[in-house]
Amino acid sequence: MNAADAAYDADLLVIGGGSGGVRAARMAAARGARVVLAEAGGMAGLGGTCVNVGCIPKKLYSYAAHYAESFEESHGFGWHGNAPRLDWGRLKENRRNELARLNGVYLKLLV
């Protein structure tokens, strides 16, 4: 028998590993249900759209953008010197690292 022909015995199939899917799976499992969670991955993996391509990446980029205004406004408060330059590659790398960390948090919630 190959994996495609295998029979699965579960009480609940949760489709999607976003916040709601992970919560539903955990709540059911805590009550003794045998749970299978199906997550296709792709753009929105564990944690769902908000964590992977929506809310969290947007907030990270928005937060980074506000620093430019803060550096500019700091001159009026006695700060001197040139504002640092944005390293776009590093910002993207840090975003990827934070999303990987959050995906790991969701994975730990399931095991």
Q: PLM features: what roles do these ranges have?
A:
Residues G18-V22, G45:
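Residue-level detector of alpha-helix initiation sites
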Residues G16-S19, A40:
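Glycine-rich Rossmann-fold phosphate-binding loop(s) that bind the pyrophosphate
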Residues N2-A3, Y8-D9, M27-A33, L37-V111:
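Glycine-rich flavin
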Residues M1-N2, V22:
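A generic local structural motif
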